[in-house]
């Protein structure tokens, strides 16, 4: 049980996919302008990352390895992620049309989010079992969502602040992301895996 808790904390805080592994930067910068959109994207990504992680484990364990076709791993994981994203898009469209409109193009772009594919591939490379795959996928998703929501709230505050003209827009966003990354470095000694 402790191992699973350490894996979760390590994935969320210590080895955050956005701030440490630099995966998922496109939605991190693109969807973080408004808090409401960031929360929606975080929830959708959490669902997709967790489900894609589980599906990737099952495909690897019950299809690719038994048939000896591990070389098709990346292509099959992309296909699995695309199916999971389409399922998520249908669910969001039916349950919350407002959120569906807010997320716009970013919902289908979860398919190309490198963090989703990265989590699936790292699960296999680190030889996680089924439970660890679920926790790793969920932890990566929670870490992504946490950073996205924190960054969106900071960007909203910066938008109304008196920022010098040369720093407006992407410049101050990158500086803020860097400072946020430094803050998360404080968690480095928290968990050793």
From Swiss-Prot:
Organism the protein comes from: Vibrio cholerae serotype O1 (strain ATCC 39315 / El Tor Inaba N16961)
Keywords for the protein's UniProt record, in alphabetical order: Cell inner membrane, Cell membrane, Electron transport, Membrane, Translocase, Transmembrane, Transmembrane helix, Transport
Statement: the UniProt record of this protein carries the keyword Metal-binding: no
Name this polypeptide is given: Ion-translocating oxidoreductase complex subunit A
Single GO BP term: electron transport chain
Principal place of residence: membrane
InterPro entries documented for this protein: Ion_transpt_RnfA/RsxA, NqrDE/RnfAE, NqrDE/RnfAE_oxidrdctase
Subcellular location: Cell inner membrane
Keyword Cell membrane in record: yes
Gene Ontology cellular component annotations, sorted alphabetically: plasma membrane
């Amino acid at each position: 049980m402790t191992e699973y808790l350490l894996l979760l904390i390590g994935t969320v805080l210590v080895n955050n996919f956005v701030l440490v592994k630099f995966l998922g930067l496109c939605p991190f910068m693109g969807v973080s302008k408004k808090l409401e959109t960031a929360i929606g994207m975080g929830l959708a990504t959490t669902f997709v990352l967790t489900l894609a992680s589980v599906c990737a484990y099952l495909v690897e364990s019950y299809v690719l390895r038994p048939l000896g076709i591990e070389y098709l791993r990346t292509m099959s994981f992309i296909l699995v992620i695309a199916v999971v994203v389409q399922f998520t898009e249908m669910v969001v469209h039916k349950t919350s049309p407002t959120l569906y409109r807010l997320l716009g193009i970013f919902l289908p772009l979860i398919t190309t989010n490198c963090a989703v594919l990265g989590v699936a591939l790292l699960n296999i490379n680190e030889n996680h079992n089924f439970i660890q795959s679920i926790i790793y996928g969920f932890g990566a998703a929670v870490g992504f969502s946490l950073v996205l929501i924190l960054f969106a709230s900071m960007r909203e505050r910066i938008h109304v602040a008196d920022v010098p003209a040369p720093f407006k827009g992407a410049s101050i966003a990158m500086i803020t992301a860097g400072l946020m990354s430094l803050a998360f470095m404080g968690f480095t000694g928290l968990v050793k895996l």
